[in-house]
């Protein structure tokens, strides 16, 4: 009988590429895999369906906050969560109710599956994993983020609740993984157990051909994320462009938060405003294609939270896969890759616009240097930072130990 693994995503699968890669690897190895997600936004439901079409594993989505299938229950869940957050804000008392009533729906579905192993991938699914542990189901946790350290300190955020869940699940888990050596070291110091590291690299089979050499407008530079908003290094970029002649173009891909795009444009020097383009977020299936149409990738992560400082972002490894030279800020996670990347990744401080300008303009002014960096980036992805290599590290691929 096949081993049954349940991956607890608790999110839209189209926005959870690490789970997709994990499910692919496990199912290819002969494991029966089901991913348990959640519908938050109606417009992403069809994208989820497109992504899982033809997969060897099953995807089931529990109705989430804005799913019409929730009906009146959605209002009750949202009200309870709002009251729990208000209690935390006013009194400092944090509760699991802040994780949302949807966690109980996820647990009900998980219990019905009776998996041999359940793998948690988010703060909410940590709670599900803990409840499964109480019922003697084996669990694992993948810290694709350090969940309790994701946010800048907010009075109502349940960081202490999530930290307790992290400790409980990590203590009893069959195994734990995370996205960088820096994160593994930090988690190990806090909880006494060091997760294994699986970089969030991407399959070579999905890599498009790198872009041709720059044309008359100069190198095409790219910043990409799910959301376009403050605290993501864009203010650093705007200031850095003030130190450069407009010898290259910049594309920013992400869904603007409120009127942030307008505010950001006002910060760009006037000479640059026709050189900077903002594009709304793409389908996940289109991300690598748009990246590969550029020459330089901007990985301007900030160190305003421990999670942001310690993780290795998706975009950095996607840039390498697509043959882009990378300008990166010196967060602990990004330095971990940059140290091994030579000229393919150049690093500046998170508050050093002049340093960033020097990197960008240096590549724009020296095509040979840029081409060398791009070739090295592609080589690194082919030989080191690709999913074909990282997938082999997955503990779930090892035969289960006999009791």
Please name every model-derived segment.
Residues 174, 290-309, 324:
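Acidic donor-binding loop of glycosyltransferase active sites
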Residues 340-341, 345-353, 362-368:
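Conserved acidic donor-binding segment of nucleotide-sugar-dependent glycosyltransferases
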Residues 41-42, 224, 249-264:
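Glycosyltransferase donor-sugar binding loop
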Residues 182, 201:
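Carbohydrate-associated surface elements
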Residues 22, 93, 97-112, 127, ...:
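Membrane-proximal helix-turn-helix segments that form the acceptor-binding/catalytic region
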Residues 355, 362, 369-384, 393:
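A short, well-ordered alpha-helix in the C-terminal region of glycosyltransferases
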Residues 218, 254, 262-296:
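Nucleotide-activated donor-binding/catalytic signature segment of Leloir-type glycosyltransferases, i.e.
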Residues 296-299, 318-328, 346:
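Short hydrophobic beta-strand element within catalytic cores of glycosyltransferases
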């Amino acid at each position: 009988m096949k081993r049954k693994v349940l991956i607890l995503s608790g999110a839209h699968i189209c926005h959870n590429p690490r789970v997709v890669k994990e499910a692919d690897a496990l199912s290819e190895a002969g494991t029966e895999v089901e991913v348990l997600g959640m519908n938050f936004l109606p417009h992403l439901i069809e994208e989820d369906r497109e992504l899982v079409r033809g997969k060897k594993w099953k995807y089931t989505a529990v109705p989430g906050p804005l799913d019409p299938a929730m009906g009146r229950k959605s209002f009750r869940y949202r009200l309870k969560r709002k009251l729990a957050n208000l209690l935390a804000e006013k009194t400092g008392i944090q509760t699991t109710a802040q994780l949302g009533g949807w966690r109980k729906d996820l647990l009900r579905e998980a219990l019905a599956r009776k998996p041999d192993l359940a793998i948690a991938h988010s703060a909410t699914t940590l709670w599900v994993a803990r409840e499964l542990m109480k019922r003697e189901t084996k669990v694992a946790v993948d810290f694709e983020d350090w969940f309790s350290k994701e946010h800048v300190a907010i009075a109502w955020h349940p960081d202490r609740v999530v930290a307790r869940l992290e400790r409980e699940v990590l203590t009893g888990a069959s195994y734990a993984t995370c996205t960088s050596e820096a994160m593994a070291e930090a988690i190990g110091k806090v909880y006494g157990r060091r997760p294994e590291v699986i970089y969030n690299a991407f399959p070579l089979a999905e890599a498009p051909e790198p872009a041709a050499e720059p044309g008359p407008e100069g190198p095409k530079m790219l910043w990409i994320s799910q959301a376009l908003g403050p605290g993501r290094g864009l203010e650093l970029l705007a200031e850095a462009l003030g130190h450069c002649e407009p010898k290259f173009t910049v594309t920013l891909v992400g869904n603007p938060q409120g009127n942030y795009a307008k505010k950001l444009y006002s910060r760009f020097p006037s000479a640059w405003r026709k050189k900077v383009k903002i594009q709304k977020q793409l389908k996940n299936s289109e991300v690598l294609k748009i990246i590969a149409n550029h020459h330089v990738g901007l990985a301007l992560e900030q160190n305003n939270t421990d999670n942001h400082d310690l993780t290795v972002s998706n975009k950095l490894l996607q840039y390498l896969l697509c043959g882009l030279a990378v300008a990166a800020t010196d967060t602990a996670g990004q330095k971990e890759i940059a140290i091994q990347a030579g000229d393919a990744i150049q690093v500046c401080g998170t508050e050093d616009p002049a340093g960033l300008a020097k990197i960008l303009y240096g590549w724009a002014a020296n095509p040979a240097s840029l081409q060398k960096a791009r070739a090295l980036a592609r080589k690194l992805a082919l030989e080191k930072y690709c999913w074909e290599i990282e997938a082999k590290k997955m503990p779930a691929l090892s035969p289960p130990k006999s009791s």
